Amino acid sequence: MATLRVDEIHKILRERIEQYNRKVGIENIGRVVQVGDGIARIIGLGEIMSGELVQFAEGTRGIALNLESKNVGIVLMGDGLMIQEGSFVKATGRIAQIPVSEAYLGRVVNALAKPIDGKGEIIASESRLIESPAPSIISRRSVYEPLQTGLIAIDSMIPIGRGQRELIIGDRQTGKTAVATDTILNQKGQGVICVYVAIGQRASSVAQVVTTFHEEGAMEYTIVVAEMADSPATLQYLAPYTGAALAEYFMYRERHTLIIYDDLSKQAQAYRQMSLLLRRPPGREAYPGDVFYLHSRLLERAAKLNSLLGEGSMTALPIVETQSGDVSAYIPTNVISITDGQIFLSADLFNAGIRPAINVGISVSRVGSAAQIKAMKQVAGKSKLELAQFAELQAFAQFASALDKTSQNQLARGRRLRELLKQSQANPLPVEEQIATIYTGTRGYLDSLEIEQVNKFLDELRKHLKDTKPQFQEIISSSKTFTEQAEILLKEAIQEQLERFSLQ
């Protein structure tokens, strides 16, 4: 019988001791006492931060929102159907963050930045906090560069600048999403990264928007963040912050970004649902007391950065839905007070066939002409005043039996100006063509035409100008001013087109 020598035993023991590698760690673990309706109550999580991520035993994640003396209120980032009472929950020690990279361009993702378009995983080496602080006062500079939407009514009278927050507000089915998507389509070739955030919408509506982006070649520079109507309230609440984090990634890399939140009414409703289930005290319209902060901390992240930070920008176009045109409701007034102006879409104008249905009278941009090129200021300076006078005169004309010649001419001019503001969807115009269109209307060249002929004439004029007077576009795009030479070229093109049109 073989016997082990002392040195062999010593060697075996040494090897075993060297292989022994026991890690000692402390984990913050709690237990589920109640779960349901997307909310879980946990006991035992003593040291946990507000907003910290937690991991349930069956894989679902959640965010700690209510820190109470006896328990912690967790909102679930999933349906949580498999979570059982008494199961364990582990605090991760991390605040919610998402991966970010250039690879997100052209993709459709959810509120956790996971792809939902079936095109495979997205490779990202960096990450950003979903809720990061807004740039400080010193980090910003005033808005001075225009962000062209391609819509004549906006670019001429309610201009938007890079780094601005402009609210799009109106009833349902008034074309709010169409204004936002047309703005994205118009950024093609402008070096602007676009993020479209769909919150609580029908999957068919989001699919339609994505299809439009693909058809028009806009997905190359666009990221779509989508949480549908059947998504948990937590994810609908997080989606705008995820979109903002993706846009910020590009902004801090000296790029220009545009973000659309479609729409913040749905986010507020999701937050109200979460807050009521967490037993937070309800306020006006049953919204919690911090619903203003919900939107202000999101929209304050839009900024124009100063030269030390690279002059990047993030322009936000939040959308808010009103009920029967009531802009004095809680959420609309909150967002109006946070933003730098609003574009009001009217159901009456939409039903009258004026599309985009922008009510120019009560729409405003608080940045104003600082966000316009000089050529647009020169040509469109008085158009808002003329349209306001036309609206006033039109209301008066309903009661007056006879109008003098001057008033009749003013009414005729106003009707043609309103007609030239009409644009079909997915047909944004470059700023040079907008300037030509507005000049034609404000200088009275359309007065001799029937109203039904105005848009046909303008379409043909823009084509004629592009084909025969390419120098016009070159002058405007290079000098940004409406020079005498540009005016001569435009007048020639208008006269030629009027002669051709009269022969038809």
From Swiss-Prot:
GO terms for cellular component: chloroplast thylakoid membrane; proton-transporting ATP synthase complex. Its EC number is 7.1.2.2. Its main location: plastid. The record marks 363 as: Required for activity. GO terms for molecular function: ADP binding; ATP binding; proton-transporting ATP synthase activity, rotational mechanism. The keyword Amino-acid biosynthesis does not apply. It catalyses: ATP + H2O + 4 H(+)(in) = ADP + phosphate + 5 H(+)(out). Keywords: ATP synthesis, ATP-binding, CF(1), Chloroplast, Hydrogen ion transport, Ion transport, Membrane, Nucleotide-binding, Plastid, Thylakoid, Translocase, Transport. It is a peripheral membrane protein. Coiled coil: none annotated. It is an enzyme of class 7 (translocase). InterPro entries: ATP_synth_asu-like_sf, ATP_synth_asu_C, ATP_synth_asu_C_sf, ATP_synth_F1_a_nt-bd_dom, ATP_synth_F1_asu, ATPase_a/bsu_AS, ATPase_F1/V1/A1_a/bsu_N, ATPase_F1/V1/A1_a/bsu_N_sf. It is found in: Plastid, Chloroplast thylakoid membrane. ATP binds at residues 170-177. It comes from the Eukaryota. Belongs to the ATPase alpha/beta chains family. Produces ATP from ADP in the presence of a proton gradient across the membrane. The alpha chain is a regulatory subunit. F-type ATPases have 2 components, CF(1) - the catalytic core - and CF(0) - the membrane proton channel. CF(1) has five subunits: alpha(3), beta(3), gamma(1), delta(1), epsilon(1). CF(0) has four main subunits: a, b, b' and c. This is ATP synthase subunit alpha, chloroplastic. It comes from Hordeum vulgare (Barley).
